[in-house]
Amino acid sequence: MRLHHKSLCHILCGGAVVIATHPASAAFVEDSKASIDLRNFYMNRDFRSGTGQSKAEEWAQGFMLKMESGYTEGPIGFGVDAIGLLGVKLDSSPDRVGTGILQSDREAPNRAQDDYGSAGVTAKAKLSATTLHVGTLQPILPVVMRNDSRLLPQTYRGAWLQSKEIDGLTLDLGKLDRVNQRNSSDNEEMTAFNGGRRNIQFGSQTSSDEFLFAGARYAWSPELSTSYFYGGLDGIYKEHNFGLVHVLPLGDKQSFKTDLRYVHQTDDGGSNVDADAFGAMFTYKLGGHAFGAGYQQLNGDTGFAYIAGSDNSLVNLVQINDFGNEDERSWHVRYDYDFAAMGIPGLSLMTRYLSGDNVDRGPGASEGKTWERNTDLAYVFQSGPLKNLGLRLRNATTRSNFGSDLDENRFIVSYSLPLW
């Protein structure tokens, strides 16, 4: 659905009318909240190799209006949430399109639309510690993770049941039938990403209107948690996803975190998906410092499959790559610093380096190799008239003997304004 500038006001006013006229409890109104998030996004991607377009460079302003009601009284409480998304082009041209922050013009695909957006409503119900959401969803689960790395977030349409009746145990069950990509106004069927050297092939079915998921997460203690999830894109692929996270307190502002992940994927009748992914990330924290090291390995006849446009659960998913190609092995070193330790709360730095090899490039070809370097510098104002204003600079460089060589910069200014 195309969302024009006035639609944000219509959504907010409509939501306010629903709350104000609902005959139910005070909690429905008193527990409601609304906010508008502003995101100004500049992105420059320099294509260092190949012919054709030399770079992608665009600038845009995003508006995200969110409204959440409380629940009505009674054994089963009911409520409604709403979201309105609008992206406005500030700068683009036909020779610089393709950053992913703007939607392509429907009549001229080599141009970006002046604006784009969508609106969504979610009905919800709550019984004890169990909730059901039906409508627009933004899941962040091991088998399906909405992507929010550009101007506007990716959203899904479906139903999601979550239960926390047992202390420490979270159960999830759901079905998705449509996805609205981060630079789109349309709810569409889902497909699996098959770029890079994943060597994923489809039969006659290339998309699906059914993604089923179910899983459990259990916190055995404040230090240890485990998870299992099943996810399946009907007719294309299915996966079993296992995770373990342990944090060992070492005293004196020190800790050691272990993050282990294993995913087994197979086809579901309409593809050749066959992959096993193992990942491990270890992080030592000392005061404001964090030192991380990780390893990831892919085995099987294909690379890692996931819903196109989304994020995934690979430990080496970073700014540009996820190192999930067929047979790829990759390692990862990372350093973070929280400047609150120096008396500058809100300022943070992250830098990391990843290297991958052993990628299957086909019969007779040498192994594929790639590396990527990321640096993030971010600051959020903690007080004063600019409180909650965030500034973030993201830089990435990647080189490969089977893909594109890229240099990338993103500058993001964000601000969240509570409305009530």
Where do the PLM segments sit?
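Residues that define the transmembrane beta-barrel architecture of outer-membrane proteins
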Residues: 30, 55-63, 115-119, 153-157, ...
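Repeated loop/turn-to-beta-strand initiation elements of outer-membrane beta-barrel proteins
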Residues: 34, 75-78, 129-133, 168-172, ...
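Transmembrane beta-strand segments that form the barrel wall of outer-membrane beta-barrel proteins
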Residues: 38-42, 132-146, 171-173, 214, ...
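Transmembrane beta-strand segments of Gram-negative outer membrane beta-barrel proteins
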Residues: 27-44, 74-80
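Residue-level signature of outer-membrane beta-barrel architecture
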Residues: 27, 69-71, 124-127, 163-165, ...
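Outer-membrane beta-barrel translocator/channel fold
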Residues: 88-90, 172-207, 253-330, 395-411
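Outer membrane beta-barrel
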Residues: 67-100, 109-189, 216-224, 293-301
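Outer-membrane beta-barrel "beta-signal"
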Residues: 196, 214, 333, 375-381, ...
